[in-house]
């Protein structure tokens, strides 16, 4: 039986909007979250109470169900091994897709009331930047997905892909293999695309290419006609995309529907099988993605993870792509670091986390000076799946 859970005041995982699933019959149900129940107080040392802040609504809400499932699976496995430092994991999920002030107030209330021992999450970086202001120095905070790098806030641990490992080799490969020289950048208007683009422009220049244009689009924007007109006029070899979640789906659909898919390549970052499903098989020609995880990775660690995921949530559960699956990685990382530190206090935990090796569905991951080192894969969209073509 999976670990006890609680859905925070923002509610449980919602279905995506009807337009997102138009033409598809695959279910995104499959979360095994139980009915809400009060969590134990922090004074109960037999329980380790984790508050997982995850997108359950808004553009990042498409990853919510798989994020919940991946968290529950990791917690169940760890609890069967005796928990973390002998403490059974309990998870409370809180939505980050709504008003940012409400999200930070929830975190602040948890800290003030001793309502959680640890905060984790696979939310967007804008949420991380806000949460660390109220969490840092009080309880440990573990951030799991791809991000812009450079997180050094005391008490905050980040284990996702960063621009140097994710983007640089993919840009070099497209330059050498596809003769890509002319690039156009488009991303959501928040910190991950801002800082990632700064690094990406250097990588493109180093590879001998040049950037024709750059755009940042408000989160939740559904009309990309002006951006697409400018892209069409610029005639780039590659459009590099850092749009988030459902926003990426809308853009990529419109991109293909306007016939641009046959004229230029696309390279995306926060792209996984969930997003690919939303884009649709007919709209993915020339679409590449660089990531530390794909569902079809042919490794023993991933085979075990996929088998356990399907056994726990069923064949039609939401696919655990890179964003959702990072929640599984996070708890596996926490288990290793806590065991090494012998404590869940911030100082020893952070000391142990700075240089450590752990095993997850991605295989062996090395953390050195707080930065995750992992194999990065370049994949090409093939209908509703990704075909892995290169490991860096």
What are these regions (language model features)?
Residues 70-91:
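Signal peptide-proximal N-terminal region
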Residues 92-100, 145-149, 160-167, 187-196, ...:
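Hinge/beta->alpha junction and helix N-cap segments in small-molecule ligand-binding domains
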Residues 255-326:
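Extracellular/periplasmic periplasmic-binding protein-like sensory domains
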Residues 312-324, 335-387:
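Segments of small-molecule ligand-sensing domains
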Residues 38-47, 51-72, 94, 100, ...:
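Extracytoplasmic "Venus flytrap"
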Residues 125-130, 236-258, 381:
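Hydrophobic alpha-helical
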Residues 116-212, 263-268, 274-281:
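Extracytoplasmic ligand/sensor domains, especially the bilobed periplasmic-binding protein
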Residues 93, 97-117, 173, 222-235:
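Short, well-structured alpha-helical segments in soluble
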């Amino acid at each position: 039986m999976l670990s006890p859970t609680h859905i925070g005041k923002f509610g449980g995982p919602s279905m995506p909007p009807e337009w997102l699933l138009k033409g598809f019959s695959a279910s995104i149900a499959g979360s095994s979250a139980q009915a809400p129940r009060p969590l134990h107080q922090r004074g109960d040392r037999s329980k380790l109470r984790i508050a997982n802040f995850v997108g359950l609504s808004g553009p990042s809400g498409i990853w919510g169900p798989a994020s919940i499932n991946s968290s529950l699976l990791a917690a169940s496995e760890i609890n069967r091994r005796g928990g973390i430092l002998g403490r059974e994991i309990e998870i409370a999920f809180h939505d980050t897709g709504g008003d940012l002030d409400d999200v930070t107030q929830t975190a602040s209330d948890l800290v003030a009331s001793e309502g959680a021992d640890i905060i984790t999450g696979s939310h967007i970086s804008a949420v991380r930047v806000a949460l660390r202001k109220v969490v840092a120095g009080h309880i440990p905070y573990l951030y799991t997905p791809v991000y812009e790098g450079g997180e050094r806030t005391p008490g905050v641990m980040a284990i996702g892909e960063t621009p140097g490992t994710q983007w640089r080799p993919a840009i070099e490969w497209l330059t050498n293999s596809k003769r890509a020289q002319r690039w156009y950048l488009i991303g959501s208007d928040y910190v991950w695309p801002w800082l990632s683009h700064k690094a990406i422009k250097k990588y493109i220049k180093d590879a001998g290419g040049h950037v024709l244009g750059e755009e940042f689009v408000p989160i939740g924007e559904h009309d990309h006609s002006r951006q697409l007109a400018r892209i069409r006029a610029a005639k780039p070899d590659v459009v590099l995309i850092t749009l988030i979640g459902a926003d990426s789906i809308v853009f990529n659909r419109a991109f293909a529907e306007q016939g641009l898919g046959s004229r230029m390549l696309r390279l995306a970052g926060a792209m996984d099988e969930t997003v690919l499903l939303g884009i649709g098989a007919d709209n993915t020609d020339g679409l590449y993605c660089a990531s530390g995880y794909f569902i079809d990775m042919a490794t023993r660690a991933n085979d075990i993870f996929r088998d356990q995921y399907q056994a726990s949530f069923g064949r039609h559960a939401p696919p655990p792509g890179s964003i959702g699956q990072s929640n599984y990685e996070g708890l596996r990382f926490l288990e290793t670091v806590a065991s090494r530190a012998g404590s869940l206090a911030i100082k020893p935990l952070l000391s142990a986390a700075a240089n450590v090796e752990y095993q997850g569905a991605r295989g062996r991951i090395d953390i050195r000076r707080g930065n995750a080192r992992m194999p990065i894969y370049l994949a090409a969209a093939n209908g509703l799946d990704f075909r892995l073509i290169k490991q860096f």
